[in-house]
Amino acid sequence: APVPGLSPFR
């Protein structure tokens, strides 16, 4: 799951 506050695509 993507972490809130972070961009998993960058």
UniProtKB/Swiss-Prot annotation:
The protein's predominant localisation is secreted
Q: Which UniProt key words apply to this protein? A: Amphibian defense peptide, G-protein coupled receptor impairing toxin, Secreted, Toxin, Vasoactive, Vasodilator
**Listed GO biological process terms:** blood vessel diameter maintenance; defense response; vasodilation
Q: In which tissues is it expressed?
A: Expressed by the skin glands.
Q: Which family does it belong to?
A: Belongs to the bradykinin-related peptide family.
Described function: Induces relaxation of mouse trachea that has been precontracted with methacholine. May induce relaxation of arterial smooth muscle. May target bradykinin receptors (BDKRB).
Q: What is this protein called?
A: Bradykinin-like peptide AR-10
Q: Which organism is it from?
A: Ascaphus truei (Coastal tailed frog)
Biological classification of the source = Eukaryota, Metazoa, Chordata, Craniata, Vertebrata
